[in-house]
């Protein structure tokens, strides 16, 4: 019995996207970071949070606690809409999604090398080109029991999202091709 049949029979077993995290590693503070913030805001529709350097690296001119990156967390419909556009950009850049990108509980990451690959984006010489890492986290209905404050409980192993389930979900929902090594 395929996962699709199980999901139709038991809807509580169908995985869903918990969150999509978009990481923008600019590597320096200043103008490039503020321009990157505008780019990520146009792509996601949300204001980004600045990430700080954890340690000093004089070779790159980075000091500890200096803002050098940006990140945005998307949930719900915003996450799904962004992911559809991200997969289009991923295909345009000529990359493939490998099964090794998925961990044992179905979460996966991929990178988009150029933000201009997204639909509706054009190259602007004053902005330049920015790449990003996209991390997708899965869950099933009922995962709230592990994070709620009262009567917290563990998720049983049979209710965790499996790697194969996440791959099938991504292929069916977004039409992405996952290559098995």
From Swiss-Prot:
GO terms for biological process: translation. One of its GO terms (cellular component) is ribosome. The lineage of its organism: Archaea, Methanobacteriati, Methanobacteriota, Methanomada group, Methanococci. This is one of the proteins that bind and probably mediate the attachment of the 5S RNA into the large ribosomal subunit, where it forms part of the central protuberance. In the 70S ribosome it contacts protein S13 of the 30S subunit (bridge B1b), connecting the 2 subunits; this bridge is implicated in subunit movement. May contact the P site tRNA; the 5S rRNA and some of its associated proteins might help stabilize positioning of ribosome-bound tRNAs. This is Large ribosomal subunit protein uL5. Keywords: Ribonucleoprotein, Ribosomal protein, RNA-binding, rRNA-binding, tRNA-binding. Pfam families: Ribosomal_L5, Ribosomal_L5_C. InterPro entries: Ribosomal_uL5, Ribosomal_uL5_arc, Ribosomal_uL5_C, Ribosomal_uL5_CS, Ribosomal_uL5_dom_sf, Ribosomal_uL5_N. The gene is rpl5. Belongs to the universal ribosomal protein uL5 family. One of its GO terms (molecular function) is rRNA binding. It comes from the Archaea. Part of the 50S ribosomal subunit; contacts the 5S rRNA and probably tRNA. Forms a bridge to the 30S subunit in the 70S ribosome. The keyword Cytoplasm does not apply.
